[in-house]
Amino acid sequence: MLTQQLLSIGVNHFLTISVILFGLGMFAVMTRKNAIVILMGVELILNAANINFLTFSKYNGGMEGVMFSLFVIVLAAAEAAIALAIVINIFKTFKTVDVSSVDTMKE
């Protein structure tokens, strides 16, 4: 019974989840001022792209989506490491992670 329900999941379901994740990520990036929340929004956007790549890869039968998805995962890991290092330096300098209060990089 459970396997029949899982087999009935189509492209529309995956794309709907992807659009919801992308929308939440864009909302976080556009409206929040905390740098860490903005980074989480960017990660949500990248995960939405991964779901799209994997969905079209599964239903087209090719491996290109899987390869793009692995590339995006590596890119997201590097982006997170670099961005968190920048956020830590901003916090050490300005004692805040609010991006609206950081308008210059000098002390």
UniProtKB/Swiss-Prot annotation:
Q: Where in the cell is it found?
A: Cell inner membrane
What family name appears in the similarity comment?
Answer: Belongs to the complex I subunit 4L family.
Q: What enzyme category does the UniProt record give?
A: translocase
A single GO cellular-component term from the record reads: plasma membrane
Chain ranges passing through the membrane: 9-29, 36-56, 68-88
Task: Report the function annotation for this chain.
Answer: NDH-1 shuttles electrons from NADH, via FMN and iron-sulfur (Fe-S) centers, to quinones in the respiratory chain. The immediate electron acceptor for the enzyme in this species is believed to be a menaquinone. Couples the redox reaction to proton translocation (for every two electrons transferred, four hydrogen ions are translocated across the cytoplasmic membrane), and thus conserves the redox energy in a proton gradient.
Q: How does it sit in the membrane?
A: Multi-pass membrane protein
Q: What protein does this entry describe?
A: NADH-quinone oxidoreductase subunit K
What quaternary arrangement does the UniProt entry report? NDH-1 is composed of 14 different subunits. Subunits NuoA, H, J, K, L, M, N constitute the membrane sector of the complex.
Q: Which UniProt keywords apply?
A: Cell inner membrane, Cell membrane, Membrane, NAD, Quinone, Translocase, Transmembrane, Transmembrane helix, Transport
Q: List the disulfide bonds.
A: none
- Give one GO biological process term: ATP synthesis coupled electron transport
Q: Which Gene3D superfamilies match?
A: 1.10.287.3510
- Pfam families listed in its UniProt record: Oxidored_q2
| Catalytic reactions on record | a quinone + NADH + 5 H(+)(in) = a quinol + NAD(+) + 4 H(+)(out)
Q: Name one GO molecular function term.
A: NADH:ubiquinone reductase (non-electrogenic) activity
**Domain of life (superkingdom):** Bacteria
**High-level lineage:** Bacteria, Pseudomonadati, Chlorobiota, Chlorobiia, Chlorobiales
Q: What is its EC number?
A: 7.1.1.-
